[in-house]
């Protein structure tokens, strides 16, 4: 059997590994967080393949200049590698499922052929939302527009105007905002002590929308000084739009973005195209109708549609296009993405959905002898859906490719041809090859449920109507741990967002009524969205403790002698940073058709700061040392600084002690990003009466990590916290859940129905539940 032979791999924390990975087989790499899985798969195998490819196509050592060579002795029999990860470098809102899979291009060709005749020819790009001649001039083909939301501007209509019912005018009694409101009320004869609910429609219109451009002399207090100047009296909405005109949401105007929301374009109704373009039909439907159809419905429609204009001369071309579309749709549906539609923007997909879209694209690709790198392909998938991703992986193998996947899911691992386990722990002490097997063992479990607790207080949300959820009622125990379950697209994330928005009083129109929950002080949503997208965003900056760390360095005798203040230790301000890389430690190499690449700054060697700043030490550590050492190794340095110590301790409790404070946020996995957010929340929040909403917190964790995380959740519960978790891991659910809300086995438009809710054992025994008979399995 031919293998990829890796010798002396020592990238990051890898301990000079020597191993072989079989070609044309399916290999799973597993282990605890920070044990070296990504260092082996992405930073060694994939990075060397990419570097060798660039070097090969340029015909010289140009590739070596563009990319750093991985720390490895040699890699033999390495094939071209394709990274199908959770992150996707093209996050342009114009990138859709249709464009990424190329289905939209086939569909445009189909429209052009059918609508062309001997007298007139229709161009394919006439149906493109990127074509200025075709797209809606108001939204420029995005299908949405940003408007000021009345519900965000006035979250509570039972508050008086004087007390800040309209948030834009909220301020102290002598503030500019309050005086502006008083002037508006005086000019239009409105009682400032009225509640918004008591205002007439005309009065509310005058406060929100009037734009008479009346000049008014305003006297107000700013700090300790009293100021006077002329202002233009206008309602809150035109005032906000004036601040953010041109879509500029820079630092000076971002404060007003909280009042804005995206809604379908009022001109095109979300179709993205001009009216004249929508007059062209295919089988009685226009282009937008088809792009808005769920993929599973589109598959049935495209297979059976008829159109009288398809003549014999067109029939062959139409048949080829239809077959190509059906082939690509089938691949998407097989990966349980049938609830999506072609016009769904790529940035709005979850990491798991994006990865499955890309896998589906590869299933219809004719390339062979590739190495596919998959990053937790089971993430976001219910047990019943994982068999589909296993079949897709095996299809890639049958086509003559090699698959190397980082995964923790036992069902997926048991289907592989080879398992590589790294460990034994994360961070500097990890990176060892613990086990390699070419005959994965059968894995099973028998669930042991958490002890049943009694709850007397519940909060209830009645008649929920949002996205695919219609008329559903829920109740959640105060002080309990509630798990939301169901297959992909069934409504889990939608329900979680409803809960968050209802407690933040943002959208009263998405539910009928809410009962209970008055004692919940704060809602803390903790999702897997990236916490940063540039090298400037780091773990330490997100945790909010870098100011304190810089202040400690500025107080040292050496810094005082050099007259270095705290800003000299900032990566974002001129003075102390390396100006060659502007404090990032990296230089970005931009490619037109590949993700951006980063190489170590040749001047500072990745240390981010100039030599003067690096000569300053705090507790025998430079600022570079602090940023580059694992949290486990530096926490004792800050044991006398309560806020820093608390944040670092929370990171270690959540199994993130292997991370470095200077690690770029964009390099964190979704699971790591979520736990960093949770660590920040734990270190900043006062305990008791908070509501935590978590999105698949076990993603990226092995059994050891999960056990640690369970202890964190149970300790939070003991402090009277209420926790809501979207989750698929049935073993985790059984160990932590006091209550389950299940959406069943149907996703998309037919989903959104709560089929079971109650005690875990009750839901697991409910035949309609997605958890039915999953309390004991062998695979």
Language-model features, listed with the residues they occupy:
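Walker B catalytic motif
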Residues: 345, 376-377, 664, 694-697
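Conserved D-loop/post-Walker B switch-helix segment of ABC ATPase nucleotide-binding domains
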Residues: 383-391, 703-711
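H-loop/switch region of ABC-family ATPase nucleotide-binding domains
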Residues: 406-408, 727-728
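Short, glycine/charged-rich "phosphate-handling" switch motifs in NTP-dependent
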Residues: 418, 739, 757
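Conserved beta-strand-loop-alpha-helix hinge in the C-terminal portion
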Residues: 421-446, 745-774
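ABC-family nucleotide-binding domains
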Residues: 375, 382, 695, 701-702
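A short, surface-exposed alpha-helical micro-motif characterized by mixed small hydrophobic
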Residues: 413-414, 733-735
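P-loop/Walker A nucleotide phosphate-binding surfaces of NTP-dependent enzymes
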Residues: 2-348, 355-361, 365-370, 392, ...
């Amino acid at each position: 059997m031919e293998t990829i032979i890796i010798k002396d791999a020592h990238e990051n924390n890898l301990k000079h590994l020597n191993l072989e990975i079989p070609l044309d087989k399916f290999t799973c790499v597993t282990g605890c967080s920070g044990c070296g899985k990504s260092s082996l798969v992405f930073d060694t195998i994939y990075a060397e393949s990419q570097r060798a490819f660039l070097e090969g196509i340029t015909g010289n050592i140009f590739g070596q200049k563009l990319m750093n060579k991985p720390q490895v002795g040699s890699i033999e029999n390495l094939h071209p590698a394709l990274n199908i990860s959770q992150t996707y470098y093209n996050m342009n809102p114009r990138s859709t499922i249709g464009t990424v899979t190329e289905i939209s291009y086939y569909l445009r060709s189909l429209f052009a052929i059918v609508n062309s005749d001997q007298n007139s020819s229709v161009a394919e790009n006439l149906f493109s939302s990127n074509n200025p001649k075709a797209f809606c001039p108001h939204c420029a083909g995005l299908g949405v527009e940003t408007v000021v939301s009345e519900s965000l501007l006035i979250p509570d209509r039972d508050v008086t105007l004087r007390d800040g019912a309209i948030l834009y005018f909220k301020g102290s009694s002598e503030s500019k905002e309050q005086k502006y409101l008083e002037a508006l009320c005086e000019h239009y004869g409105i009682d400032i002590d009225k509640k918004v609910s008591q205002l007439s429609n005309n009065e509310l219109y005058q406060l929100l929308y009037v734009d008479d451009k009346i000049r008014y002399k305003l006297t107000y207090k700013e700090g300790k000084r009293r100021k006077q100047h002329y202002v233009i009296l206008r309602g809150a909405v035109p005032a906000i739009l004036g601040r953010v005109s041109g879509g500029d949401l820079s630092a000076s105007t971002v404060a007003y973005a909280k009042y804005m929301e995206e809604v379908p374009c009022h001109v095109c109704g979300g179709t993205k195209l001009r009216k004249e373009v929508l007059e062209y039909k295919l089988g009685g439907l226009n282009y937008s109708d088809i792009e808005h159809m769920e993929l599973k419905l589109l598959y049935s429609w495209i297979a059976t549609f008829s159109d009288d204009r398809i003549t014999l001369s067109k029939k062959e071309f139409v048949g080829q296009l239809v077959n190509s579309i059906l082939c690509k749709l089938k691949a998407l549906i097989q990966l349980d993405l049938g609830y999506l539609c072609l016009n769904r923007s790529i940035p709005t997909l979850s990491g798991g959905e994006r990865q499955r879209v890309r896998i589906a694209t590869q299933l219809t690709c004719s390339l062979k002898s590739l190495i596919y790198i998959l990053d937790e392909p089971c993430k976001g998938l219910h047990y019943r859906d994982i068999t589909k991703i296993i079949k897709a992986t095996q299809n890639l193998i049958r086509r003559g490719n090699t698959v190397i996947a980082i995964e923790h899911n036992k069902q997926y691992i048991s289907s592989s041809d080879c398992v590589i386990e790294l460990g034994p722990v994360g961070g500097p002490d990890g990176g060892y090859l613990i086990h390699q097997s070419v005959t994965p063992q059968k894995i099973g479990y028998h669930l042991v449920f958490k002890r049943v607790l009694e709850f007397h207080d519940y909060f209830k949300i009645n008649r929920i109507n949002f996205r695919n959820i219609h008329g559903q009622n829920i109740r959640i125990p105060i002080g309990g741990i509630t798990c939301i379950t169901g297959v992909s697209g069934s409504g889990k994330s939608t329900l979680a967002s409803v809960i968050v928005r209802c407690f933040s009083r943002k959208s009263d129109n998405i539910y009928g009524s809410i009962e209970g929950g008055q004692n919940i002080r704060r809602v803390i949503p903790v999702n897997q969205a990236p916490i940063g997208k540039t090298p400037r965003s780091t773990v330490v900056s997100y945790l909010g403790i870098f100011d304190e760390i810089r202040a400690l360095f500025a107080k040292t005798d050496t810094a005082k002698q050099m007259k270095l203040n705290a800003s000299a230790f900032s990566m974002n301000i001129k003075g102390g940073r390396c100006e060659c890389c502007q404090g990032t430690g990296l230089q970005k190499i931009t490619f037109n058709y590949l993700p951006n690449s980063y190489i170590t700054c040749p001047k500072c060697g990745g240390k981010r700061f100039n030599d003067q700043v690096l000569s300053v030490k705090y507790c025998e550590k430079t600022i570079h040392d602090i940023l580059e050492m694992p949290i486990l190794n530096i926490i004792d340095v800050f044991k006398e600084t309560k806020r820093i110590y608390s944040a670092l301790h929370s990171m270690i409790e959540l199994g993130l002690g292997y991370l470095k404070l200077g690690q770029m946020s964009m390099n964190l996995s979704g699971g790591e990003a979520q736990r960093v957010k949770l660590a920040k929340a734990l270190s900043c929040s006062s305990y008791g009466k908070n509501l935590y909403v978590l999105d698949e917190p076990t993603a990226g964790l092995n059994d050891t990590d999960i056990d640690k995380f369970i202890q964190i959740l149970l300790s939070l519960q003991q402090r009277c916290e209420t926790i809501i978790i979207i989750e698929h891991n049935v073993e985790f659910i059984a160990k932590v859940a006091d209550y389950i809300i299940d959406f069943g086995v149907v996703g998309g438009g037919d989903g959104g129905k709560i089929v079971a809710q109650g005690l875990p054992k009750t839901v697991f025994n409910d035949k309609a539940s997605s958890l039915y008979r999953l309390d004991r399995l062998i695979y």
